[in-house]
Amino acid sequence: MRLNIAILIMIAFIILLAFSLNSPKMDQIKIGAASEKTDELFSSLIKEKEPGAAVLVVLEDQIVFKKGYGVTDLRTFNPIDSRTNFRLASLTKQFTAAAIMLLVREGKIKYETRLTEIFPDFPAYGQKITIRHLLQHTSGLPDYEDLMPPYDGQRPVEEVQIKDRDVLALLKQTSSLRFEPGTRWAYSNSGYVLLGLIVEKMAGQPFDEFLRKCLFLPLGMGSTLAYIRGKNEVPQRAYGHRKRNGKWEESDQSPTSATLGDGGVYSNLEDLAKWARALRYQTFLKKEEWDLLLTPVVVDGPGPVEPDGTPAAYGFGWFVNPWRGHARMWHYGETSGFRTAIQCFLDRQLTVIVLANRTDLEARSLSLQIASLYLD
């Protein structure tokens, strides 16, 4: 049954993409109206001197909307703009997956390489887990957040933050999996932390440096980086916030904010527009790699779901289920003080990105609200 569903999704992608070259073009009046409504939406949600968001809309290779709202923090009150860098949270996973695909292209690993081939001292169940399982969230690994001791707030959060190597150590102490690898789907931050470590080990250089040299700089994404406290600095940085008892407070770091492969990248609208262009023209990925990226995982048990439980589809680092009949690749991110989302509608050449440094803005739903203005 799940195989049939996956086949239907792939057929839908092929049919929808077949029309992409002849997709209807919006006239300037409609684009202007959609952009005006987008501006009205965010202006109504965000006051001038409070944490805010940055919003980007790219249509048919043209940036039709790009604007910042609110401020980067409550100390400097610097206004958010298109060069403000936000923690991307799980939008990072698309870059981690891309890094793995580069290593496969170079012949350094295979998608069927097993975890114990890379980490020989990993528990025996690692013999059943492949890189493909990690990419598609079908490994059965427990989430490392469930293995950590609770944070009591007695020490500064930076002193108790878990790093990627700490996650590996925790998993090595785990004697069993949540389920047999490949039999069901469960979103796994642990898997993507391990993928970052795999990149590091197989490339022979730190994960952050590999991303910068082999991915970000070649695409002109000069401000994008995997942040490591004490090693690099985030330029024009936005800090995360939450509202408590009616007042805003900085909430930028948590015990899990220092891991890289699952959520450690910072970026801005200018750089992400370049990333969207690379995706649009497939300048970074070869056709066979692109096809793999968009191929939905097939499992016998429970399959991919959206945060609200809606059935979904997942490829390599991206959700790939259509929306309102449009071929789509997308992801969302949630971490301490930040909410992020990217929506790419492949048949309409439309990309929507929302980056927020406050937790009360649901970037995923807002990005779809924006998309509907340009798709309708």
Please describe what each predicted stretch is.
Residues 129-137, 224-239, 303-316:
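Charged/polar, low-hydrophobicity segments characteristic of intrinsically disordered regions
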Residues 2-7, 11-67, 200-213, 217, ...:
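Catalytic loop of the DD-peptidase/beta-lactamase superfamily, centered on the K-T-G motif
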Residues 68, 145-149, 154-233, 257-273, ...:
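Catalytic-site signature segments of enzymes, centered on catalytic residues
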Residues 60-62, 72-74, 139-140, 359:
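Solvent-exposed coil/turn segments that connect beta secondary-structure elements
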Residues 55-62, 87-110, 114, 134, ...:
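Alpha-helical scaffold elements that line and support the substrate/ligand-binding pocket
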Residues 64, 122-130, 140-147, 179, ...:
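Secretory-pathway/luminal and periplasmic proteins that interact with or process carbohydrate-rich
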Residues 51, 74-188, 205, 242-252:
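Active-site-proximal loop and beta-strand segments within enzyme catalytic domains
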